[in-house]
């Protein structure tokens, strides 16, 4: 099963230049999640 996931984890050759961007993409929802807490702290958790 691990071999199957490893096969899909590699980007095609044409997209190798975008590898650093693709590595950061999963973190974007986490930034929004943290932004919710910062926003609520700013308005006093109403």
UniProtKB/Swiss-Prot annotation:
Pfam families: PsbK. One of the components of the core complex of photosystem II (PSII). PSII is a light-driven water:plastoquinone oxidoreductase that uses light energy to abstract electrons from H(2)O, generating O(2) and a proton gradient subsequently used for ATP formation. It consists of a core antenna complex that captures photons, and an electron transfer chain that converts photonic excitation into a charge separation. The keyword Aminoacyl-tRNA synthetase does not apply. Keywords: Membrane, Photosynthesis, Photosystem II, Reaction center, Thylakoid, Transmembrane, Transmembrane helix. Residues 1-9 form a propeptide. It is found in: Cellular thylakoid membrane. PSII is composed of 1 copy each of membrane proteins PsbA, PsbB, PsbC, PsbD, PsbE, PsbF, PsbH, PsbI, PsbJ, PsbK, PsbL, PsbM, PsbT, PsbX, PsbY, Psb30/Ycf12, peripheral proteins PsbO, CyanoQ (PsbQ), PsbU, PsbV and a large number of cofactors. It forms dimeric complexes. It is a single-pass membrane protein. This is Photosystem II reaction center protein K. InterPro entries: PSII_PsbK, PSII_PsbK_sf. The chain crosses the membrane at residues 25-45. GO terms for cellular component: photosystem II reaction center; plasma membrane-derived thylakoid membrane. Belongs to the PsbK family. The gene is psbK. GO terms for biological process: photosynthesis. The keyword Thylakoid applies.
